[in-house]
Curated annotation (Swiss-Prot):
GO biological process: negative regulation of DNA-templated transcription
GO MF terms, alphabetically ordered: DNA-binding transcription factor activity; transcription cis-regulatory region binding
Protein name: B3 domain-containing protein At2g36080
DNA-binding region: 38-144
One GO CC annotation: nucleus
Entry annotated with the keyword DNA-binding: yes
Source organism of the structure: Arabidopsis thaliana
């Protein structure tokens, strides 16, 4: 593989890191703007063939009041719009069933259940924007789990790691401090942290030769071309000779 290909891969991973950081920041901003409204544990009928979710009466009348809507809207129902943990919009038909005297979400609910793989015992979470009272959010939590779908999404984003595994193209630079070395990789000085028990064997002619067979090095960029911190595990195969 050519040096240009390695350089392109390095740039690609750097862009991916930046995008993940932007998504993480957006997610944090959204969470800070949310105000918890209520939670609804799902019953078997909520995820069954009735294709509807029953909203507890006290929560329905407090947060989604139909009394303020027009008479025809009360009969036909309203469209309630929500955003999920990824910012995807969801629209549900919201109405009052006289037969069961209950407030329900109908159209659109079965698709949400299917996409999120919800089962009886799981919990649906409802939130509202702190400054925009007409903006609602919907999330979910698995049965017996203390973290919500939003928490899980942020956890994956914050722990997403980018790894880079070149096998060539590194050039040694005459710089060493303690058990660390500096390598120059594609024009970027990288500090290499060596294991404490690592040593370089000497040859009869006085030169130092080291052979690494999948030895692990940890590199940290010394320039600001790429967003720090940028962790890379780089494995070298083959022999590299450096003369003193």
């Amino acid at each position: 593989m050519s040096i240009n290909q390695y350089s392109s891969d390095f740039h690609y991973h750097s862009l991916m890191w930046q995008q993940q950081q932007q998504q993480q920041q957006h997610q944090n901003d959204v969470v800070e703007e949310k105000e918890a409204l209520f939670e609804k544990p799902l019953t078997p009928s909520d995820v069954g063939k009735l294709n509807r979710l029953v909203i507890p009466k006290q929560h329905a009348e407090r947060y989604f009041p139909l009394a303020a809507a027009a008479a025809d809207a009360v009969e036909k129902g309203l469209l309630l719009c929500f955003e999920d943990e990824e910012g995807k919009p969801w629209r549900f038909r919201y109405s009052y069933w006289n037969s069961s005297q209950s407030y329900v979400l109908t159209k659109g609910w079965s698709r949400y259940v299917k996409e999120k793989h919800l089962d009886a015992g799981d919990v649906v979470l409802f939130h509202r924007h702190r400054s925009d009272g007409g903006r609602f959010f919907i999330g979910w939590r698995r049965r017996g789990d203390s973290s919500s779908s939003s928490d899980s999404y942020r956890h994956v984003q914050s722990n997403a790691s980018l790894q880079y595994y070149p096998h060539a193209g590194a050039q040694a630079v005459e710089s060493q401090r303690g058990n660390s070395k500096t390598l120059r990789l594609f024009g970027v000085n990288m500090e290499c942290q060596l294991d404490s028990d690592w040593s370089e064997p000497s040859t009869p002619d006085g030169s130092n030769t080291y052979t690494t067979n999948h030895d692990q090095f940890h590199f940290y960029p010394q320039q600001q071309h790429y967003p720090p911190p940028y962790y890379m595990d780089i494995s070298f195969t083959g022999d590299m000779n450096r003369t003193s």
